[in-house]
Amino acid sequence: KEKVYWFIRNNSRNAFKDQRILLKNLESGIILDVGAHIGNTVKLYRNYFPGYKIFCIEPFSESCDYLKKRFINASNINIVEIALGSKDETKTLFVSNFSNLNSLQRPNERAWGFADKKSVDVKTTTLDQFCYDNDIKHIDILKLDVQGSELDVLMGSKKIFEKGNISLV
């Protein structure tokens, strides 16, 4: 624990390089980008971890369509149109004027940019169930950017965390 803190405090200049070093430069593995949006982070992960299988998890269909076009020739990238949460259910996704602010949490309409323009129902599942369905035994990197629903995702990840099968969050 102290070594990781020392490493981050003294060497962190590029989060992707740091993750590569912390994973001991393994040539293959699994990355889950939960809240992939339009794939900007996926593109960076693809550059730094070319041998890894990357799952883009995104509930907004328009973003998924864009991701499919953007990574059409990337055989190591899987786009999955679903939201992760604490249980399997249907939830409301509040769609903002700015798609990077879409959220399962009701927006504060007085906050800048957070007024929703529409809402859509989306299917949610747990990270544990997602891993089971996709035969994922270990996650090397779990990236979460889900606009306030991070705790819900973690609540649905109890089994994989209890087994110690996630390297980096």
Per-segment meaning from a language model:
Residues 1-168:
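Phosphate/nucleotide-binding beta-alpha loop and adjacent structural elements of enzyme active sites
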